[in-house]
């Protein structure tokens, strides 16, 4: 009888394991169980990437934003994602209203559904980091880690193309961004393409690490066009929160450090790991990649006929990474959203320069 109970217990544990989300291959974000067209304003944030983590941390602690959305009957809800591409299905299916996305996920989303690009949240260079000097000239056959369908994926494609190679000429290793520095140090990969803080962590912890390629990279606050049409006032309050986040950090270093600490707290709560980045390193990244970017979150105007993301769009289209019928006009329409101008024209209503954050 005792043996029967033991076997019953083992079978129960086995059944629980086999039916768990992890064992069934269910994505981590499935547990959010986001419904379509919820009353709340649901935003996807990225607590493992900088400076996106800081902007997400400030938006979700913004008391002014929360009060305004509550008054509209649309409470704020934020959800953490490991990468922007994990949000795309949810944004396309009205399960998220907005997300902080890199350039490639923004393009991929615009190819699928109508979106509004509300503002710039990062402008910098994504890096290809390697253990070996001169690796760029000898990429063929190397093990290169990347995050599929991310801005770093685009940088990796650029690096390969610059030496006449394609994805088929290397061994691609899909890997979480926070695992890349350790994998490089352990020799499990020969290099990785990533956004901050992974390059900074690798360079600080591994003397042999080198940046062998940099590619331009940008992040955006992206809203679904359906959300903007149905709830234009709520959309404008989100834009005001983005302005507040950047302007508050620009006031002084103490504010930047507070944003970093909140972001690190959120990242650790999400990943279950202690931050690998120091406070000073995170402040440097934030200053370089968004705080000191002139006029941000305003998106830089076109230079001649050179529109934002047009080069990236054309490059990805040539490589067959976009649906064949995708037109540039869809992305151009996304950049035409004038929420920033509307908020800036009514400061008394949207309070973009008044600050009230939860500790």
Predicted segments — roles?
Residues 49-50, 231-323:
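Secondary-structure end/capping motifs
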Residues 8-19:
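Bacterial N-terminal signal peptides
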């Amino acid at each position: 009888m005792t043996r029967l109970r033991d076997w019953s217990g083992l079978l129960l544990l086995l059944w629980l394991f086999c039916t768990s989300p992890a064992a069934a291959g269910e994505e981590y974000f499935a547990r959010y169980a986001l419904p379509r067209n919820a009353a709340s304003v649901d935003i996807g944030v990225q607590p493992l990437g900088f400076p996106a983590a800081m902007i997400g941390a400030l938006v979700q602690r913004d008391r002014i934003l929360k009060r305004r959305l509550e008054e509209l009957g649309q409470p704020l809800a934020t959800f953490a994602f490991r990468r922007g591409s994990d949000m795309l299905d949810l944004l396309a299916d009205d399960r998220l209203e907005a997300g902080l996305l890199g350039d490639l996920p923004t393009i991929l989303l615009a190819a699928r559904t109508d979106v509004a690009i509300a503002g710039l949240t990062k402008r910098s260079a994504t890096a290809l980091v390697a253990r070996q000097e001169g690796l760029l000239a000898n990429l063929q056959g190397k093990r290169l880690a990347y995050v599929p369908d991310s801005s770093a994926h685009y940088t990796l494609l650029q690096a390969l193309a610059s030496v006449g190679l394609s994805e088929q000429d290397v061994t691609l290793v899909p890997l979480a961004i926070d695992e890349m520095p350790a994998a490089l140090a352990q020799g499990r990969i020969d290099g990785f393409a990533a956004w901050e803080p992974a390059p900074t962590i690798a360079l600080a912890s591994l003397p042999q690490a080198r940046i062998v390629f940099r590619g331009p990279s940008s992040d955006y606050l992206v809203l679904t066009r359906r959300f903007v049409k149905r709830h234009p006032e709520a959309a404008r309050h989100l834009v005001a929160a983005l302005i507040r986040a950047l302007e508050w950090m620009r006031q002084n270093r103490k504010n930047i450090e507070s944003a970093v600490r909140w972001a690190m707290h959120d990242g650790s709560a999400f990943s279950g790991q202690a931050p690998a980045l120091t406070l000073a390193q995170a402040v440097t990244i934030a200053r370089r990649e968004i705080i000191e970017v002139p006029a941000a979150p305003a998106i830089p105007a076109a230079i001649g006929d050179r529109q934002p993301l047009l080069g990236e769009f054309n490059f990805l289209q040539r490589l067959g990474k976009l649906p064949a019928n995708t037109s540039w006009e869809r992305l151009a329409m996304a950049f035409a959203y004038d929420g920033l101008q509307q908020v800036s024209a009514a400061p008394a209503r949207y309070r973009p320069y008044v600050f009230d954050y939860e500790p």
